[in-house]
Structures are given as C-alpha cells and as structure tokens.
A protein has these predicted regions:
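Non-catalytic cap/lid and distal C-terminal segments of serine-dependent acyl enzymes
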Residues: 1-129
Length: 129
C-alpha cells in the first residue's frame, strides 16, 4: 500500500499507482486507522472525493493469506479484489490483474505484466513544458 499511500496524501505529486500484491490488509493499525491499510477499502476511497489517479493492481491466486477468510482482513486476494470493486464503483481509471496459479509477487508474473502495467499507468501522459 506504500505507492497508494504516497498518492493518497500527495495527489499533487503522484497520480499513477502500480501495485503488485498490494498490502491493503490490516497489518498495522492505529487510532487514526483502526483497520490499517484496509481503511482504503472500507472508508477512505468510498467516502472521499475522487482523486486524479490511474491505478494498476495485481494479486495472485496463492498470494499472502489466500487460505484465510475475510473476517481478519489479512487475505491479500480478497483485499485486492475488494479494492478493485471500490475503484470500479468510484469510476477510477484502473486495471486489476488476477494471476491464476501464481504466488506472492512471482518473477514470472512481473516479467509478463510489467510492460503492460507501465503502458497503462502512463497512458495519455503529456510532459509539462
């Protein structure tokens, strides 16, 4: 969730987010974020104005926590799929890639998807002059 966090708090600087196996789960929480990074899914994105983001996210079938249920909010597969659903509902420019038969950030997945991911997040980019 690090790339997303940078964009969320500094949308004036960051508009493009590329995430492999995004940690949108409840690993660390605080009084300000009782659900940890799951706050993006549960509260921040649903209740906030749309930001100028272009987001590409990927998760693998056998990613971290894939054998656990949703109740603990520590399943990367469920969290990334739910995040994609929130992005769709808010009409963000996003792509969600689900890699069947793969595990957490496997090299073969990155090798096969990184070119397309970079093309997607930089689509329609015009440099400032």
């Amino acid at each position: 969730a690090a790339a997303l966090t940078m964009a969320w708090f500094r949308p004036d600087l960051y508009h493009r987010v590329l995430s492999y196996s995004g940690t949108f789960v409840n690993l660390r929480n605080s009084p300000e974020a009782p659900l940890g990074a799951y706050e993006y899914i549960e509260n921040l994105f649903p209740s906030s104005e749309k930001k100028p983001f272009r987001i590409w996210i990927q998760v693998s079938e056998s990613d971290n926590g894939s054998k656990t249920g949703a109740e603990g909010r520590r399943n990367w597969v469920i969290a990334n799929a739910r995040f994609a659903k929130v992005l769709k509902e808010k009409r963000y420019a996003y792509q969600f890639v689900y890699s069947k038969g793969a595990g957490h950030t496997q090299r073969k997945v990155i090798n096969n998807t990184l070119p397309q991911a970079l093309e997607y997040v930089w689509l329609d980019y015009t440099p400032r002059r």
